[in-house]
Amino acid sequence: MRILLLTPNSRVNRSGNRNTAERWAVLLCELGHDAEVRTRYEGQDADLLIALHGEKTQEGLMAFRSAHPDRPCIVALTGTDLYPLISATSLESLELADGVIVLQKKAIELIPDEFADKVTVVVQSVNLPQSRQGQNGASDHFEVCVVGHLREVKSPLLTARAARDLPVESSVRVRHAGGILEEQYREWVAAEEAINPRYEWLG
């Protein structure tokens, strides 16, 4: 099957949506399909469209549906589709979709009942590296990794600020990986690192 994965164009090379689309493409190819990732629908011939982010890929979804009304379309609702609220545009995309993917069970609670029969939960997976235990000795810290670009909609410093309230004997350290997409976070990250010994921004 020829599968087209449509992901939003992003200001950063490796957005969460792009990473998800690339990973799904690999998994689909491993299952014997021909899968490709694009940021625009430009008339590509495909048997199935998977559109990541119902709002940002709606134009491509509508164009594919118009060109191939008999071919299935799946909409994957990603983070900012759902939070803080589902937009009218995303709801229109759900109307067009034959199936809807969400990435965690709690997301189902945010989707109107009329679309419930379309929804499937696909829990994200990752290839784990070989264990590094013992290579550098035992750590004195319990490390929490936050992965996400810094922009307001994601509340990216929430974990760091929560870590400030931990008891002094706690061994928790917060390491944050993600690009700065809103410039004010450059100053806020520096300030957080200066006052919070538990927090480190990795870039």
Where in this protein do the model-derived segments appear?
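Conserved donor-binding loops in enzymes that form glycosidic bonds
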Residues: 8-10, 79, 124, 146-152, ...
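Short N-terminal targeting/anchoring amphipathic segment
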Residues: 39-59
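Active-site proximal beta-strand in glycosyltransferases
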Residues: 48-50, 64-82, 99-102, 119-120
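A conserved, positively charged/aromatic
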Residues: 84-98
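Acidic anion/phosphate-binding donor-loop and adjacent secondary structure
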Residues: 85-86, 126-141, 183
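A short, active-site helix/loop in glycosyltransferases that binds the activated sugar's phosphate group
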Residues: 96-131
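Conserved donor-binding/catalytic core segment of Leloir-type glycosyltransferases
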Residues: 136-154, 159-166, 174-177
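Nucleotide-activated donor-binding/catalytic signature segment of Leloir-type glycosyltransferases, i.e.
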Residues: 176-178, 186-203
